[in-house]
Amino acid sequence: MRLKFLGTRGDVEESSRKHKYHSSLLVTHKGFKLLIDHGLISIPLRKIKPDAIIVTHAHPDHFTWLKKDEEYKGKIYVTRETKRASKFKKNFEVINIDKWFKVGPFKILGYRVIHSLIAPAIGFKIKGNKTFIYNPDLIVMKRKSVLKGIDLYIGDGSTVTANLVRRKDSKLFGHTRIQTQVNWCKKYGIKEAIFTHFGKEPIRWGDKKLEKKFKQEEVNVKIAHDNMTMTL
């Protein structure tokens, strides 16, 4: 599998040369191009030419069709909530939560994560020749057992030290820290982790400072940047 981070920026005003576009990942396997998320500030789909798109949730930095139409005739796999939130009619396929489904050569599991009150989110466990997790926006997974048997964890880089967990009544929303996710990797024996979807604090820190902060032996932590590619 070939992974290309088309964008690595969250829904923040801050940006940099390395973090310009909203977080999006292109996964290519056996000639099939799977795009994960496509926000308002993204490379045009006519240039990416994905065979299918899967979407984590209906926030504008992940789902352009909340505010702006973009022509695409392929299938877009979304939750029921995301489909309802779309202002434009597209070729949507509804994801059944906690049930595996097939897209091209990939087996995919969409599972609930706690992140937003108005746009319920999911993460993805994706199997090709290897298995990886994609959690660009979350506080916590509702079922951490999805972390078992993972070759790579791709997670939420919104915050390093700032507490971005908020509460309304008894419900939580927001983002967890990078270190919390690294600790999950340690617990489940995941040796490789990459962070994307950077917020204000991490963008101001810069990639070199982030890499130094999280350099360790148990988990090989990498900081993704726009146009970064890797083979899994």
Predicted regions and their residues:
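Metallo-beta-lactamase
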Residues: 6, 78-129, 224
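Cap/insert and terminal regions of metallo-dependent hydrolase folds
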Residues: 141-228
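Divalent metal-coordination and catalytic microenvironments
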Residues: 3, 57, 108, 124, ...
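Active-site environment of divalent metal-dependent phosphoester hydrolases
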Residues: 59-63, 83-85, 101, 116-118, ...
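Conserved beta-strand hairpin/beta-sheet module of binuclear metal-dependent hydrolase folds
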Residues: 1-46, 120-137, 152
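Active-site metal-binding motif and surrounding structural segment of the metallo-beta-lactamase
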Residues: 34-79, 150-153
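Active-site metal-binding loops of divalent metal-dependent hydrolases
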Residues: 8-10, 38-41, 57-58, 113-115, ...
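Active-site regions of enzymes building and remodeling cell-envelope glycoconjugates
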Residues: 50-54, 71-76, 88-98, 107-108, ...
